[in-house]
Amino acid sequence: MSTETELQVAVKTSAKKDSRKKGQDRSEATLIKRFKGEGVRYKAKLIGIDEVSAARGDKLCQDSMMKLKGVVAGARSKGEHKQKIFLTISFGGIKIFDEKTGALQHHHAVHEISYIAKDITDHRAFGYVCGKEGNHRFVAIKTAQAAEPVILDLRDLFQLIYELKQREELEKKAQKDKQCEQAVYQTILEEDVEDPVYQYIVFEAGHEPIRDPETEENIYQVPTSQKKEGVYDVPKSQPNSQPLEDFESRFAAATPNRNLSMDFDELLEATKVSAVTQLELFGDMSTPPDITSPPTPATPGDAFLPSSSQTLPGSADVFGSMSFGTAAVPSGYVAMGAVLPSFWGQQPLVQQQIAMGAQPPVAQVIPGAQPIAWGQPGLFPATQQAWPTVAGQFPPAAFMPTQTVMPLAAAMFQGPLTPLATVPGTNDSARSSPQSDKPRQKMGKESFKDFQMVQPPPVPSRKPDQPSLTCTSEAFSSYFNKVGVAQDTDDCDDFDISQLNLTPVTSTTPSTNSPPTPAPRQSSPSKSSASHVSDPTADDIFEEGFESPSKSEEQEAPDGSQASSTSDPFGEPSGEPSGDNISPQDGS
């Protein structure tokens, strides 16, 4: 019976110890609760305190422990015993109290404890190193029971304090950063919010663009506020063919006084036939400058040149009633590149005789495919000054400087005197105007009836292959078959006067090379179909320009009143007749 009772007591005691070991929770919350306040209390005896040289070291602690035990052994031989104490472990550190009096003997904070060591010879003894730099001491303690639980509590305490300190520092740092951000934001808000710098930094994400991109003008365009008459915006895209609406609006902007219903068809036809090339942009080199054409839209080629109407305003009384006088002719003295067929056409010889004695002023260069406003006879008021138009006073060397500056490409009209390949074109304005049929038939049959051509001397540089001029009319081809090929680069007028036989021919039969059908209107701006409609006698004047001087002398008497009224501003003798002064009634 007694044996069973002893066994039951032993089982209960062991169970309590096991449950105490298994049930010990070392979580953070439990440890905080454990070391809060007075902390954990242990009964022990103080072995002694010894000064050491370093803050860490296991050998250092073991040597100090053996030294203190030797001191205690000598005192015990004298009958002295170790001091009984109890120590507490808390967040405040290690505190040692006297068991009898309860007085605080020693207090060492956690940050002062630098090393903890266990005695390798006695499981109930341990020690720790405490103190500040230069004053380190080793405290040796012998516990009532095993020293391992005390050492574990000290380890947990140090680990918990370290983690709490790290977390506190992180929280402080985060709080400090947040406070700094809040302070900066508050400073920005307190400052002038209208400052564009702060707007860009703080409020950039919520703002829309100041200007709508669709309303912004293209950087390659001429600003609308700086637009002038004849200056156009650069289109954003370059289509192959311009729409008719865009063409009509540009033409109306350049020529506000033109009648679009009359001239839109012919200008549209000219635009279709004449392609925009580098050579066409600078016009014809062998054609005299225009003296009556209205100002044309500004282009990169003639933006620095004055308009022809401003240069020579006093010539409308001589050529105002003539159809060829109102046609704008590109200048040949600033032009570059080869002559294209679309700029020749049915050019009368009368215009080649305009420049007398001196080089005329340079007019603007007319681009090839830009719609040009060709002046009507009544658009410009008559003035008091006129050009001398005496045909016999044209100096051959008037245009000699153009030989070295901008030579004419003679290959455009080289080759034997063979009929040029022509492509008949359609003319809506001429088809709709029956008044122009009769003058055109007469021009095709009788324009060259009083001339005979002398075979020009062979030119070595000419090639056997004659280029085909697809943009010329039949009258243009017959014109060159009768008169000759284009002049070489040495001369800037169309023909060499010395090579023409001016002997009149009595035969009135039309040339076999001249086609009987009406010649279609060419794409050259030298003469438009509107000129035929406005003045049917222009073809008669065109015929008179090719007549011999003898015939002109015969007609000088009826036209004496008109010739005498025309003054000669260049001081040239006005006794010789001119093809421009011939009356249209005589030509018919």
From Swiss-Prot:
Tissues in which the protein is found: Expressed mainly in brain. Specifically expressin in cortical neurons.
Coiled-coil residue windows: none
InterPro entries per the UniProt record, alphabetical: DAB1/2_SBM (IPR048559), Dab_PTB (IPR048561), PH-like_dom_sf (IPR011993), PTB/PI_dom (IPR006020)
Residue positions, PTM Phosphotyrosine: Y198, Y220, Y232
Location of the PID domain: 36-189
GO molecular function, one term: SH2 domain binding
Biased composition (Basic and acidic residues): 15-26
Keyword match Cell inner membrane: no
Name of one Pfam family that matches: DAB2_SBM
Compositional bias annotation for Acidic residues: 537-546
Comp. bias intervals (Low complexity): 503-512, 523-534
Subunit field text: Associates with the SH2 domains of SRC, FYN and ABL. Interacts (phosphorylated on tyrosine residues) with CRK and CRKL (via respective SH2 domain). Interacts with SIAH1, LRP8 and VLDLR. Interacts with LRP1. Interacts with APLP1 (via NPXY motif). Interacts with DAB2IP. Interacts with ZSWIM8.
PANTHER family registered for this protein in UniProt: DISABLED HOMOLOG 1, PID DOMAIN-CONTAINING PROTEIN
UniProt domain comment: The PID domain specifically binds to the Asn-Pro-Xaa-Tyr(P) motif found in many tyrosine-phosphorylated proteins.
Protein's recorded name: Disabled homolog 1
Species this chain originates from: Mus musculus
Gene name, Swiss-Prot/TrEMBL: Dab1
